Amino acid sequence: MKHIPRKRFGQNFLTDDTVLYNIIRAIDPQPQDTMVEIGPGLAAMTRLLLEGVQQMHVVELDRDLVERLKKSFDPKRLIIHSADALQFDFSTIPVPAGSKLRVVGNLPYNISSPLLFHLAEMAPHVQDQHFMLQKEVVERMVAEPGSKVYGRLSVMLQWRYHMELMFVVPPTAFDPPPRVESAIVRMIPLAQPLPCDQAKLEQVVLKAFSQRRKVIRNCLAGMFAESDLLEVGIDPQLRPETIPLAQYVALANRL
């Protein structure tokens, strides 16, 4: 029976074989990898990944799709977690000593940002991540200071990862086609992020970008004096989108 994509799960299934093979080439699965796919859907990518790995895990919320997966794959090779990826504890996936998780997925666009922040908590235990996301989101993730789209997502994720937009995917590659272009992003956790308390950095960045049109002195009024900004090399008249990650970290370390 044909599965009808569900809007509430943000389901857009990747059906273009050329795009699928390009994604697999970018991931380059190896037999001993501990691979976990978020939202396998109709398993188009799952099947190709299983050609390269001995065993993999999938996290799927849609119970109908979970049943399809159970009927289609050997349970010794495909371990299915019927769960919401936003709530799932990825540390429960067993990984051989000396290895790390490889995480992949065509992420539901309606939960992409909170899911990326949830996964960031697992960064020390992850080798890499390859995700299909809305192109606009990927552009925000990799944006540099001075860009119109540089913001909270850019700073918080660049503190944790080296990221690269691999290639753009047109709406026609999906069923049903989304209204926007998509892109593949590669995320490699940094071995040594700049020393900083994550909660404090989040606090600073959230306040800084809550009023983008104001200068940083006004955005952070009540949290930092102008002298604090000057001491970490920030011109108080700059706008928040022009300030690099290292200076946000320096501010967080003053809290």
Swiss-Prot record:
UniProt xrefs under InterPro entries: KsgA/Erm, rRNA_Ade_diMease-like_C, rRNA_Ade_Mease_Trfase_CS, rRNA_Ade_methylase_Trfase_N, rRNA_adenine_dimethylase, SAM-dependent_MTases_sf
GO cellular component, one term: cytosol
Pfam families, alphabetized: RrnaAD (PF00398)
Lineage: Bacteria, Pseudomonadati, Pseudomonadota, Betaproteobacteria, Burkholderiales
NCBIfam families: ksgA (TIGR00755)
EC number: 2.1.1.182
Protein family: Belongs to the class I-like SAM-binding methyltransferase superfamily. rRNA adenine N(6)-methyltransferase family. RsmA subfamily.
PANTHER family: DIMETHYLADENOSINE TRANSFERASE, DIMETHYLADENOSINE TRANSFERASE-RELATED
Protein name: Ribosomal RNA small subunit methyltransferase A
